[in-house]
Amino acid sequence: MTRPIQASLDLQALKQNLSIVRQAAPYARVWSVVKANAYGHGIERIWSALGATDGFALLNLEEAITLRERGWKGPILMLEGFFHAQDLEIYDQHRLTTCVHSNWQLKALQNARLKAPLDIYLKVNSGMNRLGFQPDRVLTVWQQLRAMANVGEMTLMSHFAEAEHPDGISSAMARIEQAAEGLECRRSLANSAATLWHQEAHFDWVRPGIILYGASPSGQWRDIANTGLRPVMTLSSEIIGVQTLKAGERVGYGGRYTARDEQRIGIVAAGYADGYPRHAPTGTPVLVDGVLTMTVGTVSMDMLAVDLTPCPQAGIGTPVELWGKEIKIDDVAAAAGTVGYELMCALALRVPVVTV
C-alpha cells in the first residue's frame, strides 16, 4: 500500500466557482487565471472543468502550449508578456495574447516577423510598482503600438495592489483613469477581490484566480463564506501512530509542546515535504474522523502530531483532513502566518492527486 496522504480535486466545485464569478460580474468576460500550474492544482487536470471560461491567463509558455495541445482554441493571455524577442514566433504560432509592459518589448514587436497581428494587453502601473508603464506614458505607448502592423486588438490592463480595501481601489482607479484619458479602449483590471467586491472595476474582462479554487483573496474565509464558493482541493491523510503522553512529556523536535495532563496524540502521515506549512504552530485546526481538533508540536518533514482528546475513538487508519471542505485552507494558512495561495502552490510532487 502507498503512503496514505493524497490531494483530491473537486471539479464540480471548480465549475461552480466559475459560475459564481459570472454571477458576480455578469457583464464582463472571464479570464480564468491558471498560472503556477493552476495554483498547484495541475493545469492538465483541471483546465477542461473550466471549459466554459472565455479565456485562460497564465505565465509559462509551456503551459500555454499544453492548453493548445489539449484542444483549447480560445484566447490565452500571457500575463508577464514575452521574455525574449524570439518568443514572438511561438506566440504567433499558438495565437497568444501578450501583455506589454516594457520599452524593449515595443522594439521587439516592431521588428518581429509575424504571420498575423498579435492581440496586446498594455499594462499600466497603477501603484503596484512591479510591471507596467507610468500613467503619463500610456497614451504615447498606445499610439506607438496602434501604428504597428504586428499589433491586433488592444486592451488596457492593470493589477491592483490593494483590491481588498476601498481606498486601494480608488487610488489605483484614479491612476488608470489618468492613463486612459483620450483613449476609447477595452479594459481588464479586476482580480479576484475586485471581481467579488468592486463592480466599478469589472469593465470588459475580469481575471479571477484564487476564488476559482475556493479560497479567499483576503486570506480570511469568513469574507467569502456566504458567496457559495467551494474549496476545490482537499489534502487528507491518516493516523499512522498513536502515543499516550504523561503530564509533562513533550512532543516533536525541540519539545515545543508539553502535555499538561495525560493525553493521546495521533501521528499523521503529512509533513512539510508534502507542502504542509512547517511553521504551523500548535493549535492549527485539523479534522480527525470528522471532529475538529488541532496540531501539537513542530511539523516534521514527513509527519505531524494532532491532539486526540476531542476524538477518543481515533486510532491507526483514522482519516484526517488537513485542509479542504471542512478545514479551510485560509484558516491553516493564517495559523502558519502565510496565505492560501502559498499552500496551494507548495503542494509537493510526491503527493498523489485524484480528481472527483
From Swiss-Prot:
A cellular component annotation (GO) from this entry: cytosol
Active site: 35, 253
Domain of life (superkingdom): Bacteria
Cofactor: pyridoxal 5'-phosphate
Modification N6-(pyridoxal phosphate)lysine occurs at: 35
EC number: 5.1.1.1
Any one Gene Ontology BP term: D-alanine biosynthetic process
Gene Ontology MF: a single term: alanine racemase activity
Pfam families: Ala_racemase_C, Ala_racemase_N
Job description of the protein: Isomerizes L-alanine to D-alanine which is then oxidized to pyruvate by DadA.
Protein's recorded name: Alanine racemase, catabolic
Organism name: Escherichia coli O6:H1 (strain CFT073 / ATCC 700928 / UPEC)
Lineage: Bacteria, Pseudomonadati, Pseudomonadota, Gammaproteobacteria, Enterobacterales
